């Protein structure tokens, strides 16, 4: 009988397959519950509560239902969504009766009998037959626990279930021991809509005329924070990573009225975010290393570089703003080619102009960042502009015509505002923070998304104050957005059972991370980390008698030139209002394979290193860095190692021989007329080494520009891409990515401008996609 009853029940609970609770009616009893059916094990969980009290305390009881196949040897429910410090209900079939108990655990050990006041009563509607067992029960004293924790029946929360196909040790004993569950999962529930005016009728065995009340009390609480157990607050959108993609998405989604949680694994950066890492000479201002543009080069020489991610083997920023808080801040509005279908963007993305316009209106670029409108330390610009004019280049204000990228040079452009580093932190994040529906948490690391098949239930964090054991759920139609950067997002996907099998198996070999993996039959095979790109870059070092190398930036943190420091502190003007880059240039090259490649150059006083047999004046050195960008064909692979550190598995630099040929041609062209500039000498490489020999000997690690894209690329097929045209991860219902990993091909300039325009467009597409909150 129960088997047919369950089949009749399935149409009513079909909506619950998304693993966010919805209402259904048991066709045998007529009782109306709120719950889910787990599609993997075909177990139904339902709950109904007494009517909400209009005054005074709420009732602490409910009626629950579990319908499970006979193969389910025991079922567990964690009322707070976690095993530890959470009221647990355990039940199994023993012959013609259901055996049940309330349990408690303070660690990942065998739960023991709960010593509180909760009372379980099996109701007469309980049935067992040859295929299924149904347990209908009353749980009194079950929403408030003796340790001070509980669930808030007026708000939203999360429940966890446990399933085992291994029988308990003594089925006749309610306190029997048993082996660890063979599977578990979570689901979100809106308790405020799970109350029924017919609750007393249900206790009397009468369904009455089932109606539910969805009226909320005038005052609600979203979480219970007393005691060691915390009930999680669900969000419409949980965004992982406060880099440029995450911040822009958070601002636009909260602007649309969505309840948004933004999580950042690192801490504050700029003064505005609560940062306090201030140079000794700048203490009166409170402006940090991340505020003052002229301190950029000191990021790489500091003895305590806490801002770099310690579990990623390349430079990656783990702080508010991500890479935009620690990069050189070069900022180029994308050109039409950067969003072309020819480089991999879906046709629906090619009209980037409205989104780039939204970006530039919020965050305009400047090529004269000093507040007095003057440019400083421009000697290298003057020298190289002469060199480039001799090669047929024209000078322009680069961002006035983003499509002009051949034989053009101009002053370096930045996303600084008022003489300080700005980017999305000073703009988009600030408007988001002003909204009551936006929550921002720092120093919270997300290890994985928690999912049941294709449905993401929430995220697992290291912060137990935000949810049971750190789990934070999304609302029934909620979504998760990963914006943790190319390496961070890839690792989260691997640890969530999404990606190439070898990467998930690497997670499986880690005893800590393996416990959070979904069952192998729920792994999603996608090319995460494949096809990664980064600009190969080569440094050429020169001297010229007019150059001021600015002590190679060595003294800017502890002992700057007094006049420059004083000028900056007075009104954010002068040398310290700008970063080290002074000039940028581009040139297009036709490769022998038919692809047009673009070379970009960046000029700055000083040098990261000098390797020369020639005598030289260190106070007169400057660097031209030459990159290859759009059109490059080389790709590599990023992933994780056995310690789960993000790392480069297959280097992507100059794998394609034509890429190398074009880069060498660009290097030769840059120095082709060096003799026409009196006093200009190239010292790295010097006369003892050809450019070919120099490139062949170049350390690949220093060829890395940290402009990683395409690791979770956008596309039309899960065989070749990770996200679809709505930036939704293939094989999932509600997981999205908004960071540089979705960019299918290197843009013509430094990628942060393209990324931020893409984030504007991604946020719009996510909001427009049906089925969301």
Swiss-Prot record:
It catalyses: D-cellobiose + A = D-cellobiono-1,5-lactone + AH2. Residues 235-773 are annotated as: Oxidoreductase. Binds 1 FAD per subunit. Binds 1 heme group per subunit. It is found in: Secreted. One of its GO terms (molecular function) is metal ion binding. It is an enzyme of class 1 (oxidoreductase). FAD binds at residues 236-265. GO terms for cellular component: extracellular region. Its cofactor is FAD; heme. SMART domains: DoH. This is Cellobiose dehydrogenase. It comes from Phanerodontia chrysosporium (White-rot fungus). The gene is CDH-1.
